[in-house]
Design a protein with these regions (language model features):
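Intrinsically disordered, low-complexity regulatory segments
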Residues: 7-160, 169, 230, 336, ...
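Conserved short loop/turn motifs at secondary-structure junctions
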Residues: 22, 102-103, 179-181, 258-267, ...
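Basic, low-complexity terminal or inter-domain segments flanking catalytic cores
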Residues: 22-25, 36, 45, 171, ...
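Short, polar/flexible loop-turn hinges at active-site or ligand-entry regions and domain interfaces
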Residues: 73, 101-103, 120-126, 145-153, ...
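C-terminal or mid-to-C-terminal helical accessory/interaction module adjacent to the motor/catalytic core
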Residues: 133-215, 258-262
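Metal- or metallocofactor-binding catalytic centers and their adjacent structured scaffolds
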Residues: 234-268, 442-447, 453-456, 560, ...
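Short helix-coil junctions and helix-kink-helix linkers
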Residues: 273-285, 471-482
């Protein structure tokens, strides 16, 4: 028996040595990830990248065999053929192939496609997963390989096929009914619906006015007490009557209570909460956040960035405990494991956290450092003690009335997690800072009135969505998953259904009534209201497409239905439902709707709105979506005389433009004269009035009147335009529509979020990718900050 045991141990050791010495090929998705992993593995391992998916549905074909159980027809794209041939050659040389793509459904599908296309042998192929790129995680994964999880692959395939069916069948309907080259997507259409409905809510909102009363009292010992009245007044007269009743009134502390409060930290980051906080605290777009997080993950600095779990590993919990203890002491530690609330949370992921909690900072670009710091602070705070506060509430009675004032004081007695991190909100004004002390007060104490004010306020319309608040809403409704939030928000902007923009505020007057001494004074002040920055706004095309889909495809546009489809994908991922059965059920309900909508003949074109009659011709005036965007039309196609068209101005919308505004657009074009035997005209279009000459268009500035502009002025504008012709777009990026590489008067530059960044002369602008663009931006920002710092130093001298 002992001899057999000895031989068995020897054999195991030989097997282990063989595995170390053999030729191993590890395949991951990205070169950056490959580079990091290669550092952790020995010389027996070669790590190569597949550069994402190596096989997909054909881009311009339907590529689904409906009759053959919804079989997808895949192809290897032209730009991936050389990658595939390299991987095939290396796989043939390898004794063992390790498929190490990401651990989610998309990653599982990449591994499955690699297995199929490279024609790998199951006996010499292993699937490994990890949610952080650290040496211990990689070695542990190699010790615990598994097979490809076909349920996860099917869930990814189901999403891809279902979305292809919706896109390919719906888009031709939109081309025929609205305008050519439109496209529709399942989750995107529902996201557009949210934005359109919010815009209409805002337009329909009727603001109501009320008067809020606040007071400043003196305690007679040199301290002030600020308090608010418990009720609001509907009219100025009521507010004034109350203030006048306070002239002779006495103000007494009727009751005073002090109670302890505790505030607990937020859970560690999921994809959606990271996107929201990075938008609020750092001003990053959703796409930007994901791109930076991807780099941090691939460099082994944070865990996997697509997750809806708030769990932390035991190792993360213990290392957080050690860091908190060494930095702040035992009393700041409180180990917590948060419960994942999101329905259908995918796979056994962890929350997004630093791989090594001991690293408070990292090397890298300024953007990477800031996002890492945010993740580090949020993770650390989640494992810290509650903040302890003391809240004091004093009720102040007013003699001769039942009304009461309330004064509130709040003081932090132990900062706990607040020492490290404070969560942000979409509307910071809603989170009023009550951290103010009240002086020592006693029940029955008389207070002296200093002043009482009644300020006119207005009820607010709901705010427009930001990228961050839209992500939160989508998650709340159960629509989409961590991997889909960023692409959804990018796609609806690329398709021109939604645009990110600012709304200029309007000036509004409001009353302030003040009682000081025995006199009530009334003053009128003004404020700007309704101004918004970087909000998601529906375009006319987005609104019209939304209305059409709501009418003919209510199921596709239903929030609950979209969420239920996500749940079905989850069921497929868990092996509880066959993906083909899910497809069949969906298609049987969806396809007949497509055929019905194509067959319906409507009297008016979709989105058309009648404004009235043109007094000059007696013909109908309407607005609709034309081939190149929203237009005003005088007359109809049935008339002998062709209808006249004018492009709708950018500041007008199909839903709100008036007859008068529409008719004004027909006062142009007017002819100014000729230059070099070619006519110069003034016209108006989507973006306002312009001068046109030989297919050259120049916008007329707001300071000039298009009805009085002269030929000489137009000639000067055309000359300036020719000089500025260098303003040509060198490159744009679909995933970040706000960013462009342009050629300007002083050379090439990057235009991003209404700011320009010079491109160094050593760099070829056309070769820049999105990642290097952001590095150039960071570099220029840093230079700007250094210049500012130097100028401040000079001023101090």
């Amino acid at each position: 028996g002992r001899v057999l045991l000895f031989f068995y141990i020897c054999q195991q050791n030989i097997n282990g040595i063989h595995e170390i010495m053999q030729n191993n090929l590890v395949i991951v998705e990205s070169p950056a990830k490959a580079k990091t992993i290669e550092k952790f593995l020995g010389s027996g391992y070669k790590v190569l990248s597949s550069y994402g998916h190596i096989r997909d549905l054909k881009q311009k074909a339907f590529s689904i065999d409906i009759e053959n159980n919804f079989k997808p027809i895949y192809e290897i794209p032209e730009d991936k053929k050389s990658v595939v041939s390299t991987l095939k050659a290396e796989a043939k040389k390898a004794d063992m192939v390790w498929l190490a793509s990401d651990e989610d459904r998309e990653g599982e599908a990449i591994s499955w496609h690699l297995f199929e296309v490279l024609d790998l042998d199951p006996a010499t192929t292993k699937r490994i997963v990890f949610h952080e790129i650290t040496k211990s995680a990689i070695l542990k994964a190699i010790e615990n390989p598994r097979d490809i999880n076909i349920d996860l692959v099917n869930a990814q395939q189901a999403r891809r096929v279902l979305d292809r069916i919706v896109g390919f069948e719906l888009s031709p309907v939109l081309w025929r009914k609205i305008k050519p080259s439109l496209s529709a997507g399942r989750v995107q259409s529902v996201a557009v619906r949210l934005i359109v409905e919010r815009e209409r809510e805002i337009h329909a909102f009727v603001s109501e006015t009320f008067y809020r009363v606040s007071a400043v009292f003196s305690d007679g010992k040199g301290s002030e007490v600020k308090a608010e009245l418990g009720r609001r007044f509907a009219t100025k007269e009521e507010a004034r009557a109350f203030l006048e009743s306070c002239v002779q009134a006495e103000f007494t502390i009727e009751d005073i209570t002090t109670r302890p409060l505790r505030k607990s930290p937020a859970a560690p980051f999921t994809t959606s909460t990271l996107q929201q906080e990075a938008a609020r605290k750092l001003g990053y777009t959703v796409a930007q956040t994901m791109m930076i997080a991807q780099r941090l993950y691939e460099e082994g600095l944070i865990t996997y960035m697509r997750t809806d779990s708030v769990n932390l590993s035991e190792l993360a919990l213990s290392s957080s405990r050690e860091v908190i203890t060494s930095m702040m002491g035992d009393k700041y530690v409180k180990t917590r494991q948060f419960a994942t609330k999101t329905k259908g949370a995918q796979e056994a992921h962890e929350a997004i956290r630093p791989t090594y909690m001991i690293n408070e900072t990292i090397e890298g670009t300024s953007q990477e450092q800031r996002l890492y710091e945010l993740i580090w602070k949020r993770t650390l705070a989640s494992q810290m003690a509650d903040a302890e506060l003391e809240k004091t509430t004093a009720t102040i009675s007013v003699s001769g009335t039942d009304d009461k004032f309330t004064a509130v004081g709040e003081v932090v007695t132990f900062d706990g997690f607040l020492r490290v991190y404070k969560e942000s909100y979409d509307d910071e004004s809603e989170q009023e800072d009550e951290s103010r002390l009240l002086p020592a007060l006693e029940k029955g104490q008389q207070l002296e009135r200093k002043e009482i004010m009644a300020v006119q306020r207005f009820t607010q319309a709901p705010p427009r969505y930001t990228e961050a608040s839209l992500v939160r809403k989508l998650e709340e409704l159960g629509i989409g998953r961590p991997s889909t939030y960023a692409p959804t928000i990018s796609t609806i902007q690329q398709r021109g259904y939604v645009e990110k923009g600012n709304r200029e505020g309007t000036k509004r007057e409001y009353d302030v009534l003040k009682l000081k001494g025995n006199q009530v004074t009334v003053t009128v002040r003004s404020e700007m209201t309704g101004s918004e920055k970087s909000k998601l706004l529906p375009t006319d095309v987005g609104s019209v497409v939304n209305d059409f889909l709501m009418e003919y495809f209510p199921q596709i546009m239903d929030y609950n239905f979209t969420a239920s489809v996500e749940k079905e994908f989850d069921e497929v991922a868990e092996g509880k439902e066959a993906w083909t059965g899910m497809m069949k059920e969906f298609y049987q309900g969806f396809h007949p709707l497509v055929e019905t909508s194509l067959a319906v003949k409507s009297e008016h074109k979709v989105g058309e709105r009648m404004l009235g009659t043109d007094p000059a011709t007696g013909k109908p005036v309407s607005v609709k979506i034309g081939r190149f965007g929203p237009v005003v039309q005088i007359g109809s196609a049935e008339d002998e005389e062709k209808p006249r068209f004018a492009q709708l101005k950018k500041e007008y919308s199909l839903e709100t433009v008036t007859l008068e505004q529409a008719l004004d657009l027909f006062k142009l074009p007017r002819t100014l004269g000729e230059l070099d035997n070619k006519t110069v005209t003034v016209g108006t279009g989507r973006f306002g009035p312009y001068v046109r000459y030989d297919n050259t268009f120049v916008s007329i500035p707001k300071t000039m009147d298009p009805m009085t502009i002269t030929l000489e002025e137009a000639e000067e504008m055309l000359r300036a335009k020719r000089e500025a012709e260098a303003q040509k777009v060198i490159k744009t990026f679909a995933e970040e529509p706000d960013l462009q590489i342009l050629n300007g008067r002083y050379g090439p530059y990057i235009a991003y979020q209404k700011k320009n960044y010079k491109i160094p002369s050593t760099v070829e602008p056309a070769d820049l990718n999105l990642e290097t663009c952001f590095k150039v931006i960071e570099l220029q920002k840093a230079k700007g900050e250094n210049r500012k710092a130097r100028s401040v130093v000079k001023k101090k001298k």
